[in-house]
Each structure stands twice: as C-alpha cells, then as structure tokens.
From Swiss-Prot:
Keyword Heme: no
Protein species of origin: Aeromonas hydrophila subsp. hydrophila (strain ATCC 7966 / DSM 30187 / BCRC 13018 / CCUG 14551 / JCM 1027 / KCTC 2358 / NCIMB 9240 / NCTC 8049)
Name of the protein in question: Large ribosomal subunit protein uL22
Role of this protein: This protein binds specifically to 23S rRNA; its binding is stimulated by other ribosomal proteins, e.g. L4, L17, and L20. It is important during the early stages of 50S assembly. It makes multiple contacts with different domains of the 23S rRNA in the assembled 50S subunit and ribosome.
GO terms of biological process kind: translation
Record HAMAP family: Ribosomal_uL22_B
GO MF, any single term: structural constituent of ribosome
Keyword vocabulary terms for this entry: Ribonucleoprotein, Ribosomal protein, RNA-binding, rRNA-binding
GO cellular component: cytosolic large ribosomal subunit
UniProt similarity note: Belongs to the universal ribosomal protein uL22 family.
Annotated InterPro entries: Ribosomal_uL22 (IPR001063), Ribosomal_uL22_bac/chlpt-type (IPR005727), Ribosomal_uL22_bac/org-type (IPR047867), Ribosomal_uL22_CS (IPR018260), Ribosomal_uL22_sf (IPR036394)
Length: 114
C-alpha cells in the first residue's frame, strides 16, 4: 500500500530542499516528522507539510496503520524559475532567478517491500 502527496511550485530551490529530503528518506514517519520538526531550514517546513499530507492520504484513502508507515520515496525536482530584474549602476541590470521545486513524498507500509 502506498500513498502519495505532492507540493508543486514550492518557493525554495531544489538544491536546498534535497538537503532536507536526504535526511528523512527511508525512515519511519514518526522519526522523519521528529527530524523535520526540529530542523531550522525553511525547506524542512515544506517537506513536513507534504509528509503529513501523505500520511493523511494513507490513513483516509487506504486505511493504513500510521505506526507501520515509512518514507518509501521522496523526490525533489526543479520547477520553473521566475525571472526578475535588479537594477544596477550605470543603467545595467542583473537577472534574479526565483527558483521553485516540486516535492513528492511516497509513504508505504513495511509490507510493500519497496
């Protein structure tokens, strides 16, 4: 049994979100939530919300036991970048990339064999 949750266009860079995702990949959901709760990174709060959504999906849609769930897969892909302009001296301008990420979390019980 698997349950999936996604956060698309999350306002953080994929590189920063992957640092957090690597910490919780493969852990049980209670350990993962504990790590994400006390992490000082902005991306940790985003990943935590997606993980909580995946847990709720597993409980509501599949009737899964929350204690048996673990983080089977967590992926952070790049989303589109918003281009912005910062004016500089002598009429020049620099381009600012406001990056986004797509965060996908899959939780499964131990019987899934993943």
């Amino acid at each position: 049994m698997e349950a999936i949750a996604k956060h698309r266009y999350a306002r953080t860079s994929a590189q920063k979100a992957r640092l957090v995702a690597d910490q919780v990949r493969g852990l049980s959901v209670d350990k993962a939530l504990n790590i994400l709760t006390f992490s000082p990174k902005k991306a940790a709060a985003l990943v935590k919300k997606v993980l909580e959504s995946a847990i709720a999906n597993a409980e509501h849609n599949e009737g899964a036991d929350i204690d048996a769930l673990r983080v089977a897969t967590i992926m952070v892909d790049e989303g589109p970048s918003m281009k912005r302009i910062r004016p500089r001296a002598k009429g020049r301008a620099d381009r600012i990339l406001k990056r986004t990420a797509h965060i996908t979390v899959v939780v499964s019980d131990a019987k899934a064999g993943r």
